[in-house]
Amino acid sequence: MQESQETHISNHLDEVVAAVSITHRKKFQNKLLQTALFQPPREKLHLCEEKAKSYSNSHEYKQAVHELVRCVALTRICYGDSHWKLAEAHVNLAQGYLQLKGLSLQAKQHAEKARQILANSIVPPYSENTDVFKFSIELFHTMGRALLSLQKFKEAAENLTKAERLSKELLQCGRIIKEEWIEIEARIRLSFAQVYQGQKKSKEALSHYQAALEYVEISKGETSRECVPILRELAGVEQALGLHDVSINHFLQAHLIILSRSPSQVEAADSAHIVAHAAVASGRHEHHDVAEQYFQESMAHLKDSEGMGRTKFLSIQDEFCHFLQMTGQKERATSILRESLEAKVEAFGDFSPEVAETYRLLGGADLAQGNHSGARKKLKKCLQIQTLLYGPQDKRTLATQQAMGMLSTAPKVASKPRQASKAKVAFCTSIPQDTLLGKARPGTTAD
């Protein structure tokens, strides 16, 4: 695996070099293309940098990385192999890779390349250049983030400490202004928080998240969109520490910021869903109303959706039913499940985990009401789907088989209350944690 990664990295360096080469295959008829071809390298570099920013702001990270690769090549042409600007181009490319999942190793490699170039570039007049020092902060921070993504927490913290120390020195020397330092410090504190969170040190992470949020609120405003991811990560740590009231409040604060920014229906639904989850996670009765309110709000945003929005609606609806069952509202949950069955068949197909689980829950509800015929019919349908999806030896299939076996003997043990009670337990309408709708894992076998 390591060998394949190294090969990929080697190939990737070739990609950067290849970006310099321009092969003239045919004459361009379009004057615009001819103009672009004969643009001076610095103009091309500026154009690529602008394109990369635009793609990144639009979350089109693959296209952004493609432009950043070209920037590295053009920067080498414009400034040479030993200029700090080339190191900066490598760091920008490393940041681009960090936005793509699974490419942290490439990001680390480019950050190391940048450090190597910078080490050979710090000679007069660079040693007096504030831009070089400001870039050095970015280099250490980017290296720290890359190491964090690779779960090398100690090395990540060391690089973040260097970035923090250098930023303070520049502030004290008057090389950067206070407002600029606050923006830098916000990013460094957030990365520190993520390092501690990665180490499962929630208490240490908490103070850094709080500091990061404070700095972002100062620099960007309390209702800026940049606050949302920090608020959610902060709330997650508070939740892990059992601070459910403040956790829910921070999730709500993030939700209100999202709503103030004219979100799409799906984005608004996701945000409300997060609040509902936080309220359920507290396990407290006083948060039940909050959970129901935001489940309902989430579903309202998606009610008339089609395609992916429709499947998301049905999944959230199932979680809401699970919540209702947990809070003793089983009849209401059963009614919603019955109404949802046809829509699930249409959205997921007849033979899907979602449909199988709904049949299982409805069968359990029928049994609880003494409707053995209805329970048997629904559980049989559930068993057919589970056998097809997971195989006859999967623990879910075996559990349904066992439940049907107990159901077939139910009339014979009607006079034995304790055994009848056990039979009902097997048909509990609560959704098991490892088989939440939409989370089923085909092929999982019995333990």
From Swiss-Prot:
One of its GO terms (biological process) is positive regulation of smoothened signaling pathway. Its main location: other. Coiled coil: none annotated. It is found in: Cell projection, Cilium. SUPFAM superfamilies: TPR-like (SSF48452). TPR repeats lie at residues 45-78, 137-170, 186-219, 356-389. Pfam families: TPR_12. Gene3D superfamilies: Tetratricopeptide repeat domain. It comes from the Eukaryota. Keywords: Cell projection, Repeat, TPR repeat. InterPro entries: TPR-like_helical_dom_sf (IPR011990), TPR_rpt (IPR019734), TTC23/TTC23L (IPR042621). GO terms for cellular component: cilium. The keyword Ligase does not apply. Found Associated with the EvC complex composed of EFCAB7, IQCE, EVC2 and EVC. Participates positively in the ciliary Hedgehog (Hh) signaling. This is Tetratricopeptide repeat protein 23. It comes from Homo sapiens.
